[in-house]
Amino acid sequence: MKKLVIGILGIVIALFVGLLVFLIPIYKNLPDPKLLESWTPPQASEVYDAKGRLYGTIGIQKRFYVSIDKIPEHVINAFVATEDRNFWHHFGIDPVAIVRAAIVNYRAGRIVQGGSTITQQLAKNLFLTRERTLERKIKEALLAIKIERTFDKKKIMELYLNQIYLGSGAYGVEAAAQVYFGKHVWELSLDEAALLAALPKAPAKYNPFYHPERALQRRNLVLKRMLEEGYITPEQYEEAVNKPLTVKKENKYKFSDYFLDMVKSYVFNKYGEIAYKGRLKIYTTIDLDYQKIAQKSLEEGLKRVAKIIGLPFLPKSEEDMELAYEKEAQLKRLKRGKIYVAKILKYDGNFMKVEIHGKKLKGEIKGLNTEGHKYVFVKYLGGNRAEIIPDLEGSLVSIDVKTGEIKAIVGGRSYAYSQFNRAVKALRQPGSAIKPVIYLSALLKGMTQISTIDASSKPYYDPSKGEDWIPKNYDEKEYGNVTLRYALAHSINTAAVNLLDKVGFELVLEVGKKVGLDNLKPYYSLALGTVEVTPLQLTAAYQVFANLGTECKPFFIKKIVDENGEVLEENVPECEEVLPKPETRVPVDMLRAVVLEGTARRASVLDRIVAGKTGTTDDFQDAWFVGFSPYIVTGVWVGYDVKKSLGKHMSGSRVALPIWIDYMKVVTRMYPNEDFELPPENIVVNINPKDLVLADETCEGVPMVFVKGTEPHITCSDLNAILGLR
């Protein structure tokens, strides 16, 4: 018996020594927990609007570090009750919790409960990999012990609550409080604190934005555990458990937006490591009020367009498409010509195979990009045929005329659905919106707005096609001689092409470069906007017109300050006169006529002094309106993400202009209703539109702007006298 005991004791000692031999090198090679004393996790940088209001945040991780003193006791207690009930008493690992978890998991036949402490979670997340091996678990336990020997419990809790991922892009309790509730962590109520503590186990599964019922059940479980641990009274429990979820639903898709993406790209490309570290204060030119109006105007305008073209709705997220698809499950049959939501099955060359609840269909892709999407709109064509409907999209850019500051920019109808920023990346044909460049070129050659141009149809050689091309007018009418003013106001295509031929490519391309359109090609179809531009480029070009020949380069970053208060950069307007004021003032008057008597007449409802130009491309693929007051210039584009017709008569006037009006009717009220500056070299005279002479008391007249010396001097009376002599 004695030998047996000695033998067993020897085995135990040998195992213990072997364990020490195995553990000591691992323990010695563990990271030094003192590194946490200087731990500076990536934090968010704050982006402010032009008035100093917080617009949003950017960064690798959305985190705002807060000291333990700012975190309420009920928030701390919620996490302790849920994640580590013995946190205040264990030494880094909790043997009781490990045994309890082992028993529960054994009985369940699967892992349903963990035994890791908060300190172990901290060790794993900050120092170790996520591989599931015995060695990693041992390292985690040993490192947790080391951390407990280095820091007090309050510091460990502070590190944990600032490090933990809580879903929706939020790291730490302060960021999560802002994302889910729109408030600081020290402002959270008991039920709100419990919801945050419900998230570490599975942030996606219990995300209250997407799974409110699960989140509510999990929150109530946290409250129950707080009651069991004595952190709250039965009365507090009853009050909190009966409260509904109160998350800030508008933050569901606010992880970023098109403008924040622009800021992030700019800062990270320019500052690299400094940007990754975060904690910058970035002051921008954007006005939050303008931006909200822009987003609403674009969204409402696209809804109107969607209704016209037959789209059942415009999704804000992929979730919207999924819900619509599920609702279609009750359909008994598909109606030919109707648009449905279909599930994408696979791509087959230039075709896409889709399904609508058992009905498999096939449609041509035509350049459609559905990356990241599982569902798509389709028009049922009968049999197994479908027309794949691309995303209806739009963008809006608004720039301060006098400074070049971008005041609002929206790159699409929903950032959550598509992150592609059409305002700065989408290359689209501007259609007739390019025409002011040609008309200004004619004025620089000595013509006036009442000079006439032959507007008859003529064939022109198109080098891109290698054949003759005859321009057509939107209204399919034929015209004779018309004034430049009338031709621009009514967007007569044949007049624009003939004028381009008369003025010559060299001057037109030169003027294009001066307004920032440096990719114009010497083709006659240029007069109809066959070049590709971004909405930002085209809007910036109109800024030069609105500012009477002075270009102010568009910019959106005013100042960047680092965490120490050092100014990294500060930007001011860069303005330069690129075109003569007198000649540029004349096309501004002509663009005013577009609003007063031409294709943009509906903009006159603004009762403000504005000017602008519609644009519609071939087959109604792109719809534009770019217009301005003396203070603000705004461009709107509407179209599909691929080159596809919006439908017959879906012109810039019908599609884009209403969005522009909705935005400008609010924004222009923030400025004086003043006319455009009249340089001393210009003169305003009343012109009789019938005879193109000076109006006097014998005839009606329309006020028009001329460069002094180019205005007519014959009056209606003079003309009548001359005709009488004949």
From Swiss-Prot:
Active site: E83, S432
Localization (cell): Cell inner membrane
Stretches in topological domain Periplasmic: 25-726
The protein's annotated pathway: Cell wall biogenesis; peptidoglycan biosynthesis
Membrane topology note: Single-pass type II membrane protein
Lineage: superkingdom: Bacteria
GO cellular component, as recorded: outer membrane-bounded periplasmic space; plasma membrane
Bilayer-crossing regions: 4-24
GO biological process: cell wall organization; peptidoglycan biosynthetic process; proteolysis; regulation of cell shape; response to antibiotic
InterPro entries xrefs: Beta-lactam/transpept-like, Glyco_trans_51, Glycosyltr_51/Transpeptidase, Lysozyme-like_dom_sf, PBP_transglycosylase, PCN-bd_Tpept
Its EC number(s): 2.4.99.28, 3.4.16.4
Catalysed reactions listed for this entry: [GlcNAc-(1->4)-Mur2Ac(oyl-L-Ala-gamma-D-Glu-L-Lys-D-Ala-D-Ala)](n)-di-trans,octa-cis-undecaprenyl diphosphate + beta-D-GlcNAc-(1->4)-Mur2Ac(oyl-L-Ala-gamma-D-Glu-L-Lys-D-Ala-D-Ala)-di-trans,octa-cis-undecaprenyl diphosphate = [GlcNAc-(1->4)-Mur2Ac(oyl-L-Ala-gamma-D-Glu-L-Lys-D-Ala-D-Ala)](n+1)-di-trans,octa-cis-undecaprenyl diphosphate + di-trans,octa-cis-undecaprenyl diphosphate + H(+); Preferential cleavage: (Ac)2-L-Lys-D-Ala-|-D-Ala. Also transpeptidation of peptidyl-alanyl moieties that are N-acyl substituents of D-alanine
Keyword set, alphabetical order: Antibiotic resistance, Carboxypeptidase, Cell inner membrane, Cell membrane, Cell shape, Cell wall biogenesis/degradation, Glycosyltransferase, Hydrolase, Membrane, Multifunctional enzyme, Peptidoglycan synthesis, Protease, Signal-anchor, Transferase, Transmembrane, Transmembrane helix
A molecular function GO annotation: penicillin binding
Region (Transglycosylase): 45-213
Pfam families tied to this protein: Transgly (PF00912), Transpeptidase (PF00905)
Protein family membership: In the N-terminal section; belongs to the glycosyltransferase 51 family.
PANTHER family assigned to the protein according to its UniProt record, in alphabetical order: BINDING PROTEIN TRANSPEPTIDASE, PUTATIVE-RELATED (PTHR32282), PENICILLIN-BINDING PROTEIN 1B (PTHR32282:SF11)
Descriptive protein name: Penicillin-binding protein 1A
Lineage: Bacteria, Pseudomonadati, Aquificota, Aquificia, Aquificales
